[in-house]
Amino acid sequence: MTVSTTAVVVCGFDALLPERGVAALIGDRQIALFRTYDGQVFALSNTDPVSGANVMSRGIVGNRGDVPTVASPMFKQVYDLRTGVCLDDPSLVLTVYPVRVTDGQVIVGD
């Protein structure tokens, strides 16, 4: 599920390390930002749907075939970074936020 939010500059693109996640607070929402080796940036809910803990930014970034993924650090379910859908159990879904990079700045929201 993609959620619309007011556009907010979160950080500089260079502050995101490839294949690592970082947490950010936008209003009262915790989000997890991920930058992949090919330079794509993804924004998802930081809340693990299984445990309820705000830990997704500490997940293991990788891929399954051509699908960029993050594995929950709690129970290791693997989520598609593009859609938020769990590849192991499609009933589990992370909220996806619109994200873009403009002038070297990572902007979350519309």
Predicted ranges, named:
Residues M1-I26:
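Zn-dependent metallo-beta-lactamase
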Residues G21-D110:
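Rieske [2Fe-2S] iron-sulfur-binding domain
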